Amino acid sequence: MNKIKEGANVRITIYSPEVYTYGAMLIGGILKHKGYNVHLVRKIDKTLFLKSDVIIFSLYSTLHILDKNIREAIDFIKKVRKNKTKVYVAGCVSTYPEIILNELNVDGVIVGEGEITTPKIIEGDKEGLAYKEGDEIVINYPKEKPDLNHPLPLIPKDIEQQSIRGANVYIETHRGCLGNCTFCQVPKFFGKTIRSRDVEDVVEEVKAFKRAGAKRIAISGGTGSLYAFKKSINRDKFFELLEKVSEVIGKNNLSVPDMRVDYVDEEILEAIKNYTIGWVFYGIESGSDKILKDMKKGTNREKNLDAIKLAKDCGVKVAGSFIVAYPTETEMDYLLTKDFIVDAELDDVFVSIAEPIPTTELCDLVLSMPKEENLLYKMHEGEYRKLGLSEAEARCFDLLIHAEMWKSMPKPLTPQLYNLYLNEARIQGKDIRAITDLLFKYRDLLLKK
């Protein structure tokens, strides 16, 4: 691999589709700290691409691999710049480099966490890089995981215009997850050991984002209360983190939304009430204990309801995320989820059709069953049959409408809201079918992993 010229003479562009992800900003900051000329964009900019020596496509969804605009941009760069511009893919999609290298005309895939390896790869090293050598695919996995001490991220000038669930940015406080959820990639990508940043480093970063114009900040590492976790929850460190960040940005501009029901208690919820906007987002997923067991959630219906009640008793608002059309979900399981929503009276609800992400158990399950048994490919024959929905789309649509009626503050189901939810279900179905079709193309490869 040819070594690229060094330092400020090297023009690097990082492209993060639609959203400036934290990972893209982080790698941008590390490369800038090393003296490189770095641009971070969230829209395809062919003029900038043609002036770049290195372009990193920081992708966070399997859907990006299929994105026509991304494919065309990569082909355009390779056609015009030949070998003058190196094109890499990075991000959480890097756990399946074989698919990327077969689908996209790129020089390589930066595998896993890229803080240590990305600067080395730009200098010509191959550690942490997957690439094609003739007809063979070579995958060099990183030798070590980075600690989380790093320079400030590269913060875009228009960061205040970005909104991710109401926040301008999600700042990472820790990595890793103790869970075993079958649909989640986090333990595979970041590991099961919790690695946490120093409170002071997080605070300095929040100050930098505030100076750059960010008004609303969320902090997360998958499950907020696992910050500084060793053998048990470190409440003192978690409270210190919330208090100090809140002092900088203000409690009405800080959220720590992502929580597991088995890692909250009254003290943690009181801290969330006192130092943040006062919301938690629980990944509830299903009202069926059988499905929760199939998903390896480590919780059940009763624990979920108890955690919701506890939060409400503490004056904290609760949003719940649900997954429909999990491969083993029956009609009865789905009805139990509807019953759960009635009992829970959540303040907000998010509904997703089960998405197979490569390297997860859910992906293996989807690829191991005939497509015609997948609810994404079965036509709905019930009350919405005139809408031409798959069974998965119908459950998504139905649950969105049902949840709206049973929220703590329900909205009337206007034609506009009806069409909004119908469109949401259709888009999810279309996208996840496209992903599933792609994964079936690599079925044998993925089931071997």
Swiss-Prot record:
Stretch forming the signal peptide: none
Query: Where's the Radical SAM core domain?
Result: 163-390
Q: Which residues bind [4Fe-4S] cluster?
A: 177, 181, 184
CDD domains recorded:
Radical_SAM, radical_SAM_B12_BD
Pfam families attached to this UniProt entry: Radical_SAM
Under PROSITE patterns, the record lists: MTTASE_RADICAL, RADICAL_SAM
Q: Which GO terms describe its molecular function?
A: 4 iron, 4 sulfur cluster binding; metal ion binding; transferase activity
Required co-factor?
A: [4Fe-4S] cluster
In terms of domain of life, where is this protein from?
Archaea
What are the UniProt keywords, alphabetically?
4Fe-4S, Iron, Iron-sulfur, Metal-binding, S-adenosyl-L-methionine, Transferase
Details of cofactor binding: Binds 1 [4Fe-4S] cluster. The cluster is coordinated with 3 cysteines and an exchangeable S-adenosyl-L-methionine.
- Enzyme class, spelled out: transferase
The record's family statement is: Belongs to the methylthiotransferase family.
Q: Could you tell me what this protein is called? A: Putative methylthiotransferase MJ0865
Give the organism the record lists.
Answer: Methanocaldococcus jannaschii (strain ATCC 43067 / DSM 2661 / JAL-1 / JCM 10045 / NBRC 100440)
